[in-house]
Amino acid sequence: MSEEKPTVRTEEDDRYEDDAGDLDLGQIGSRVWLVKIPKFLMDKWNSIPEDDAANLGCVRVKNDEIQLLLQNSPENADVPKIYNLRVMNKFVRNSYVFRESETSSSMKSTALVGTVAHECNVSPVINDDYRRVMQKRALAASAPKRKVQMIDDRGGSLLAPGTLGSRSRSTTSFIRNVKPRTGEGLKNSRIPRNELLDILFKCFEDYEYWTLKGLREYVKQPEVYLKEVLDSIAILNKRGPYALKYSLKPEYKGTMDAASVELRNQQASQSESSSIDHTGKNTSPDNPGTNAEEDEDDDGVEMIDVV
């Protein structure tokens, strides 16, 4: 006759015995939707007490469009009311929803709520109500968390022994002297237009394409002035591999030296014409007034156009 060995109980056996209970499969035929909702909507629904029987909303199906509509109640005042519901997976397999609750006998009761039929995503509809709610949330998030509190002036004399010295040490510890910036005005001072044209033609002679930032760092000129001169000789490519880069206009390509000379002559003639007074004499310091005899001597000089 065989002897029965005594069994030894462990803490693990006690733990499983406490959780022992039958799984309720009565709702296995129920089809449920697994819906992913925004976090702010989940927080709003979680704040509703479980004891209150609240109608969260309804689902409206119109042709292929599915929308989630919330109740227009004070509880939903700070959240959007209309959401688009998109079915991401129409055929879900081996996914179930369970519910676990504690009974009076301190045992957990587990029940199957239903079988997942579809997986869906919920996103708010962009309308005036949504913009108003988001604007209110943005203002609340941008509000400073710390406030300045005014403290009444404490009594006592500021000239008390040791008071003046402590104030000077406390204020000088966080006050820093800002050094004046030097050379910035000279760096951005404008140069004559003809000199800037020479520099720009030299830049495009070295490299065919330039960005506005690269030219500004190279020529050290104000951006507005540089762009004004640059637009007269170059174009901004808006497409292709050299998008947002400047290149010379077709009429200046291949004849860069001649084009630069012609533009310099035009700039010089404009500056000279501005210095001629109403008598017709040139009062420019570089070209003093000429007389009739000098004009006759210039008749024998042959002028050649540079192309």
Curated annotation (Swiss-Prot):
Annotated region described as Disordered, given as residue ranges: 1-22, 261-307
Cellular component, GO annotation: nucleus; transcription factor TFIIF complex
Subcellular compartments: Nucleus
Bias-annotated ranges (Basic and acidic residues): 1-12
GO-annotated biological processes: transcription initiation at RNA polymerase II promoter
Family of the protein in this entry: Belongs to the TFIIF beta subunit family.
Function per UniProt: TFIIF is a general transcription initiation factor that binds to RNA polymerase II and helps to recruit it to the initiation complex in collaboration with TFIIB. It promotes transcription elongation.
Full protein name: Transcription initiation factor IIF subunit beta
Organism name: Schizosaccharomyces pombe (strain 972 / ATCC 24843)
Gene: tfg2
